[in-house]
């Protein structure tokens, strides 16, 4: 079907693998071209709508006119980048949610520095979870949101939910956890 192009491409790849291995076959297992944000990784269009010394909050707007009123706020782990759920267009959870009509917000945890290195768990709850909830509701004009907690982001979110329940704060209407303890 390719008129021999696939065979030639395979020979070129084998030649390049032998070059990388200094005469021995070094089989390339991944695309080694550099990742570029917005080009070949994290391609869902979003914008920062809030920032403080701990987080940046990124808003992704659905492409269509039909959208759900209640936004979705995602708390990924701080050991991953904000785009952990938007690695490739073909299997981006962010894009899938947008295509379903959801307005999506994702917390991007800033790297620890001299300002944040002594922050406690409570600081992460207040400056992370509470700040993101408030900013999401302000950006959308809604009174409630749905949330997702992923890994340690989910553990943090569950701590915040316990405090919110004890104080009568019901702004988070539903929660889903991924790989959280």
Describe each model-derived feature in a short phrase.
Residues 175-181:
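Active-site nucleophile loop of the alpha/beta-hydrolase fold
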Residues 116-140:
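Alpha/beta-hydrolase active-site loop
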Residues 1-4, 8:
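Extended, charge-enriched "interface" segments that sit outside catalytic cores
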Residues 149-153:
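Gly/Ala-rich beta-loop-alpha elbow adjacent to hydrolase catalytic centers
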Residues 13, 17-113:
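Short, surface-exposed "cap/lid" segments of acyl-processing enzymes
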Residues 134, 154-155, 178:
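Acidic/histidine-rich catalytic neighborhood
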Residues 157-161:
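Short helix immediately C-terminal to the catalytic nucleophile in hydrolase catalytic domains
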Residues 64-67, 96-104, 135-144, 163-174:
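Secondary-structure transition/capping motifs at alpha-helix termini
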